[in-house]
Amino acid sequence: MHPELLVRKRIWLMTLVLTGLFLLAAARIAVLTTSEAASLTERGIRQWTKAGIVTARRGTIIDRKGRTLAISATAYIVTADPRLVSDTERFLNSIEPVLNINKEAARKRLQDKTKGSIILKRQVSRETVDALRQLRSDAPEDSGLKALSFDEDICRYYPYGALLSQVLGLTTVDSEGQSGLESRYEDVLRGTEGSYLRQVDARNRQLDGTEGWYIPSQQGCGLVLTIDAEIQEMVEKAMRECIEVNQAQSVICLVSDVKTGAILAMCMNPCYDPNDPPRNDAETLTELMRLTAISDVYEPGSTFKILTAASALDSGVTTPQDSFYCSAKITVDGDTIRCWGRPHGAETMADGLKNSCNPVFVELALRMGTDTFYRYLTAFGLGKKTGIDLPGESPGILITSRNVKRVDLARIGFGQSVALTPIQMMMAANSVINGGKLMKPYIVSEIQTPDGETLERFHPTVMAAPIRPETSDTMRLLLERVVSEGGGKNAAIAGYRIGGKTGTAQVYKNGRVVRDTHIGSFYGFAPVNDPQVSILVIVKEADVPIDYGGTTAAPFARQIMQEMLPYLGIDPENDEKDEEIEVPALKGLTIGDAKRKLSQVGLESVTDGANTVVLDQLPPAGAKLVKGGHVMLYTAGSEEMTPEELVCVPNLTGLGDVDCARLVRQRGLTMSMTGQGLCTEQSPAAGEYVQPGTTIFLLMAGDDE
């Protein structure tokens, strides 16, 4: 081919190629500047800018005297740029000992190289961040630690630790209310988030001379509680001792202002530290966060007799001097209901309350009848929520009036066949002794701005007036006698007029009564002439030989009141300090010697009756009781028993399970029961001599109370 033609052909071909490339480039530019423009712009902005949320500080929660119970503190978010991490394992192994992260979850996030920043951990302390900064500064370039960056975050801090933990509640890592007041007042406590945008280099460092924008967050409003942190500390200290001494499954204690319904303390043990909750064990955390004082129901037992007595007096079916007779049992429509102990014989209504006599309260309930009794029970707030400002409240259980049987009514009279929450029991009992007003319990007294200005103030609310003031006056005196002469002696405090009532309730599991397992409780108030404060202590499933409320709950109510009353400025009415007696040391003594020693100083004893030597005592040596107070003597398992000594088997025929257990333990024997009700047969027979520790087999039939 002619050289000139060849050159022209090459020029033509080159022109076509260049034209094609130009057209392709133009088309690509057109695409980039039209359909892909937005996404490319966004990607570019992500590369040289960093945007984020400014977490709002939650409102502060303080007690009634201004002490901080919950506050938002500065923490940090630790992030990393996956694009700067070439060796993921080396990177994670370097930071894990300091940051304590979930390596598997972090590994997955770091594998996404399309993101410029991933969160490794939130709510990290300043100390940890400082350690990471030092680690990053000292690390070589190829370590990947230059990918780390830190931003301010907010965490919730509880200065008193586990104190009031269930009531205050918990927040999530995102600073959202999860339980307790944190959840109930989420809309009040949470603030308004802010945001920011800044220009950064490839290592997420802000570029000098560049501008961004920053919208600050707004702190949430705060809460002022009716809780007194100092009283709460008194209560929690006593409840820790209570659960340990009684080896109880759990304990609850409420303290309230009798006249207003304000809650001064609320303790539920076991508890947890909200600064370090077991977040990795959801089941355990859920159980620990439960507000059992308002959500769990229980048969109140004899503390309920406060309500029955008040109803009967107010309705006119009885008077304090009214005569009754207790033969240790009473039959209602063929159902035999037994008293808790030996027959009380002839007694007045006032004696019946002091003695906590079941037959007296059965008769009072039947005298009133369904319509009258239920009118009072409804006025006391039973069967409905109290309205306390906490989440998860239960209404309790009350058989409807149209479905209640006569025997049900009889049992309700002494605290069975009815279930209340602790807060219901306290508020109802308060109305009996505060002049007859059922108050709505409340725990938040004010909502405040972040600057401390009051936005809303909550006032005492009267929900009903169950009884007349005159009836309330009478009930206060009757309940004072329970503490001074009856089963509440262990709650007496020298110089103070204390009223109250003990209770021992059955425990149900799978719909059946659990043998030898009870809920002991004590409700008390002071001073009797002008009640200011009340207390309710509930001890669930104590693992001690005698688990009545008078021995498991009352001593700890006394311990709290003895410290709390002077703190509240409630002075003793007299200086009868000589009536306060120091409990002597009794361990190692025989039962006879221990009883004589107690009698000499003016104290009384209660024993499990198992053996002959005192192994332990409650209250311990050195504690103070008023004259006539009870000291528990524990003898179970004494090594002083002689194995060869024969024991005479007692006659148990016709006795109930409680009396059988008492007599059997007194002889150092054990027993096994079949059936429910009263003993109809036993083996070995009464009068036979057996070795200590022998099991007596009992056949029970008839009523099971």
Residue spans of the language-model regions?
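Periplasmic/cell-envelope proteins involved in peptidoglycan metabolism and beta-lactam response
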Residues: 1-278, 371-383, 392, 491-494, ...
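Generic structural signal for residues in well-ordered beta-strands
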Residues: 148-150, 253, 324, 498, ...
